[in-house]
Structure formats: structure tokens, C-alpha cells
Amino acid sequence: VLAAIMLAGGGSASAQGQLNLYCSVQVEWCQAIATNFQKASGVTVNMTQKGSGETLAQNRAEAQNPRGDVWFGGTGDPHLVAAEEGLLAEYKPGALGDLQPWAVRQYEAAKGRSVGVYSGAVGFGFNKELLQKKNLTAPACWADLIKPDFKGEIQVANPNSSGTAYVIIATLVQLMGEDKAFAYMKSLHPNINAYTRSGTGPIKAVA
């Protein structure tokens, strides 16, 4: 997971007195980043929070008339795609030498147009109280999620808008192979009650 530093065509935030931030992490993180940067710099931050897939689509739509300055957060692949398509500007962070090797590899793969700032793992979130109420055992592996007991009880993000959902599919393909992975997704579908726009949606639903 990473942050793209500067969107291609973005202007100087200090010169304009404002910065347009596209943020693809939890809205609470986005708000904290915007608030603290604004306090430290005096630059007004206009923040838009969307999933990685949606933000990539927005950047493509705005390619001829870029409106964003910085894209922070989300999964790595959409940032690499944006870098390859020339949607991101090249930038060298001053602290590049202090970053973890995986973060630097992201920077190198993006040819200096994106850099890793945090990493995370895909996992399952559940509400213990609801599981107890419905006499369900907490899922411990991917196979558990397709059990009939969970029919209509699961939410997952939509890969058309969410980078997290794309990572889930890519993970399943690596674990099972393409054919078995998509057969698994087909088996999982009856247990899904909603496909959310972003990867944070399902977690909020069980909180």
C-alpha cells in the first residue's frame, strides 16, 4: 500500500495557497492528514476521499485537465498503473534513504512517481456479538466464507472501485490459480449482501 506524491499537471500548492488531496485510506486518516498539513503549512487542503480504483478512474478522466495535486494511500497497483500511464509526476522524497526496502521498491517500480508509506495485510473482520447471536463460528480461512451458514452475512468491496477488492482477487488467484479463484468468487457470491465502494466499507458495517 502506498501514496503517490504528486499528480501530473498539479500546480504549486504554496503558490496557489491551496492543495487538492485525493485520499484513498479511511476518511479519519484523510481528515487528520489534511488538518495537520494545513496547520503546519498554512495551505488550505481540499480533500476528496475515494477508493483506489475510483481515484485512478478520476485521474484518467482528468488527464487533459488535472485537478488534483496529491494522491495519498490505497493499494499499490492502481498507483503503478497511474505512473505507467503518465498520470503522476516524478518526485524524489528527501527521506527516501530512510524508507523500508519494500517502499523503495515501489518507488523504483513507479520510476519515481510513487512511493510506499505504509503496508497492511488483507484479513477478515467480524462482529463477535452478532456471531454469537446467530450461533456462527468466526471464519478462520477463505474456505469458511463460502459455507452456507454465512449466506447473506458477508460484505466485500467492489473491485470496480476498490483497490482492496482487486488485491483480494489477486491474492486468491495466487493461492488457488485463476480458474479455482473465480470459481471460489462465484461460490462466495450467494453469501454477499453488499459490494461496497471501498475496502473500508465492510469493516465499518461490522463495527
Locate each region found by the language model.
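Bacterial N-terminal signal peptides
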Residues: 1-9
